[in-house]
Amino acid sequence: MTYPSELILGPPGCGKTHTLIEIVRDALSRGVEPDRIGYVSFTKKAVTEAVERAGSAFNLTPKSLPYFRTLHSLGYSGLGLSQSDLMAREDWKEFSRMMGMNFDGIIASDADDGLILPQGRDHDRYLRMIDRAALRCVTLGEEYNDQRNYDLDFFMLFKIWRGLQKYKSDYGKVSFTDMISGYVKQGSAPKLEILIVDEAQDLVPLQWKMVEVLAQNSDKTYFAGDDDQAIHRWAGVDVNLFMNCSQNVRTLKKSYRLPRSAYDLANSVVKRIHNRKQKAFDPMDREGTVNFHMDTHNLDMSQGSWTLMSRTNSFARDVAADLRDQGLFYEIKGYPSVKLEIAEAINIWEGLQKGREIGLHEVKRLYGLAPKTGDGAVIKRGIMPLLDAEPLDGTYTYESLVQNLGLLAQKETDALDMLRLGKDERYYIRALLRRNEVLTERPRLKVSTFHAMKGGEDDNVVVHLDSTKSCVTNPDQDDEHRV
């Protein structure tokens, strides 16, 4: 790579994003226009954080930062595409009909697990292999041999690839991967003074080619990431491209996330990675603690914020089930263990019991979840259409709902009896309420996979050490040590 560049290695918690925003700050202070600065990444999360931080620090709107984008978004806009150009569900149905096969059109991968997973239809596994070959910039034959998945037929693979190419050509359609490859082929890029490539260790070879197009038209390019956190090789990532992207290397030296005890444990694992860049950095000044437990029942999680991480989604679901059995409030993949609309309906009913007036939208929310037939009915059947005739700014009390809008429940009725709930869910919510959990707030306990939580932090972190046979027998154990 012949353009001016610098590789910024950011170990966990070393202020990588802060460092990159400072580069933006310096450029703006020198008079560089915001539309001459590019900030790209594979993930929307990284770009969104950069836009928010830059906008807050420099009073800039997202529109004034047109090149703070994901690579897919930049390809989409750079090629002048519209939504109608993309392969949609209707296209996959038509393609299925033409090929005499069944395709969902959903790439058979799971970024949380870090595994390639088959969907319900076997033919989608061929689509995944076709897509991964394009991302890795290898032939179908090379991809087929590398995966060693001989349950799939190579001649069928080639037939599907050829049919898909013809369909997209005939109907003028593109896939998400085509956005990247198309941008690389057209070869033009905006003139930038600064290009920042964040989380660069997660880029696949095709994305590196796109970055090359951008960097060739930029005065200075900064790559940022950490090869020790390159945990997406399953998706086609080649960490060597990251490690060799620039001759000028700067390592951030101080972690503001890792206490000494966690730092020492992490280093004992990192030393097992053979293919890595050596980097020395210091932990936080506080010691912290690392303890080993047989299971979560031995942990007192009644206070504080906790993240519980597992290797796969399946293990994460097992952890969530265990927390539920213990009567603990948690979220998994961002979803709370009690739906927010249920929690809000409980609050609405308890407000009515205390004499509070509620608005029409709250009436609709409560009524929508209330049983209207059978012995447990608390609302008259057929009352919902009448709510549409009510004034939008109307207010209601328990008494007015009984008199005018079909409320049957006694005022002392338990909030859980006001809702359609299964027996197990009823017991679970009652246990949470006994613990004085506030169900309308974000849970203190967060369940996740390692891949989904990458880059996150918490006061207390629980790491489940269970693994799978495919992980344990993986011939490249560098992947597992990084995870």
Task: Give, region by region, the residue ranges found by the protein language model.
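P-loop NTPase Walker
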Residues: 1-85, 267
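Accessory N-terminal region flanking or inserted into the helicase ATPase core
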Residues: 1-10, 18-19, 36, 106-196, ...
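Conserved helicase motor core of SF1/SF2 NTP-dependent helicases
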Residues: 11-14, 42-45, 69, 201-287, ...
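Short, polar/flexible loop-turn hinges at active-site or ligand-entry regions and domain interfaces
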Residues: 32, 36, 57-65, 79-94, ...
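Conserved beta-strand -> loop -> alpha-helix junction used to position metal-binding or nucleic-acid-contacting
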Residues: 63-80, 328-354
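A polyampholytic, Gly/Pro-enriched intrinsically disordered region
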Residues: 83-102, 243, 269-277, 346-383
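Conserved interdomain hinge at the start of the Helicase C-terminal
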Residues: 289-304
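Conserved helicase C-terminal RecA-like lobe
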Residues: 350-483
